[in-house]
Amino acid sequence: MNWLIITLESKKTEAEEIKELLVSHDATVFTFSLDKDSSKELFQMTLECDYCIWIGETVPSCQNSFPSSVYAAGYLIGKQIPFFCVRSQGCDDDFPLATQECHAYCSIEQLRLDLENRFPEFLEREKQKYARNALLEAGIPFNPDSFAFHIAANNEDECNLFIDAGIDVNSRDAAGTPMLCNAARHNRKAMIERLLQLGADIDAVSKDRGYSPVMDAVWKSNFEIVEYLVNKGANLSYISRDGQPLLVLAVGTGNEKICRILVEHGADPMLCDSMGMSALAYAKLFKKTSLIPLFEACQK
């Protein structure tokens, strides 16, 4: 990450202290002395920096004697580059540049402590920047549809870039399908685990067929994914948009192992679909002799 320190010769010692801190975290640091007042040099530095620190007597303003600093501050704030300002005068006054990306301090010590606390945030921001650039260079759009495509294709490296770039794990593709459902439909267990670790909604419902992730896994007859989602607390009582309970769907797939684990974790074999038929009724209709006693035991 690239840092720009804008300061005065009289504040050189304080600037060096902060520079040492930044370098210790593997940052690249440019230092510009306002005593030079070289607008061209400062402009080039602002183009390359990811963060900026101002160490001066006051905040940059039209009233001070350094017009290039006013330009730099305006440019950085306009580009939403985090701006950290240490001023020894007017410390109790409101900070005129205050925005979400601007931070004011009354001392170098305050700044140093805050930077130390914020470094995990800076590193995460740097990781996102790198990942987004990598996607851009590869010609990959940074959007949910593209993420869903790479989940389906099992492109692990690209999926990792989307996650590192800060994609919302609860986002949906153009059809309204949550990423977790996309992963379940394509038997991507590792991706399901990753998405849940990152906070994906385990019971998110798709807008196409109205299935939850565990319903998609049952539909695909993938026991490993069903077992994982069940153990993670997936809702087993949900009824799909077309009126199918989870266990009715499971009976339709004919996967006895899936039916058994669903019942063992509380799925109700008496819950009826839109036709008024329960999982037990379908088991009897289709002569699923191994499932009938399992379901009937739940009535007792």
What are the residue ranges of the model-derived segments?
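Conserved N-terminal substructure of TIR/SEFIR domains
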Residues: 1-49
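Ankyrin-repeat boundary/"N-cap" motif
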Residues: 139-149, 172-179, 205-213, 239-245, ...
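Ankyrin repeat A-helix N-terminal signature
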Residues: 149-154, 182-188, 216-222, 249-255, ...
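Conserved ankyrin/ankyrin-like repeat signature
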Residues: 158, 190-191, 224-225, 257-258, ...
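Ankyrin repeat domain, specifically the short helix-to-loop turn at the C-terminus of the second helix
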Residues: 163-168, 193-201, 227-235, 261-268, ...
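Ankyrin-repeat-protein effector appendages
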Residues: 128-146, 265, 274-275, 282-300
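Conserved TIR/SEFIR loop-to-helix hotspot centered on a Trp-containing motif
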Residues: 59-78
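C-terminal interaction surface of TIR/SEFIR-family domains
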Residues: 17, 93-160, 164
